[in-house]
Amino acid sequence: MSSLVQKYNVAGPRYTSYPTVPYWEENSFTKSDWESSVIKSIKESNQKEGISLYIHLPFCEAMCTFCGCNKRITVNHNVELPYISNVLKEWSLYLALLDETPIISELHLGGGTPTFFSPENLQILIDGIFKNAHKAKNAALSYEGHPNNTTKEHLKTLFELGFNRVSYGVQDYNLEV
């Protein structure tokens, strides 16, 4: 047990970046390399069971003390539509590389706080993603919510869009934490 503690009791990059930052090298990965990698990974996954998408919605109205995520703290909801527009532009870049319509078997909205976005704008985002993609029969669609801003309208809209899982990310029940 002490060897495990010794092995893992060190600072390291967050699991959300791969390859992890210490392994990045300037000019080691060309645009052509990236495109080939995207095409190969999406095509292989799409043919087997469909692709999994994670969409990062980085906005929050308040800072959680435990948060280590990439986020932007703001109460300005005018950021929603421009951000969604850019996500959909990026999605179109991926689609342009493919010769077949992707099948989405998993979609996760993470953050930040995805329910920072209005239900109407979340609908615009999800409709934009599925405009040029198929939803797998048993697709797993999930999102991270926050009890302070997830409304009944959020729940209704996301359910109607096919979302079947929500995570509220309780970190600890100790109020001092």
Cite the ranges covered by each PLM segment.
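Flexible, acidic/Gly-rich N-terminal and inter-domain linker regions that tether
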Residues: M1-S52
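Hydrophobic faces of well-ordered beta-strands that scaffold small-molecule active sites
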Residues: I51-I55, S105-L107, A139-G145, V166-Y168
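Short loop/turn motifs at secondary-structure junctions
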Residues: M63, E100-I103, K137, G162
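A short, N-terminal amphipathic alpha-helix
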Residues: V87-L97
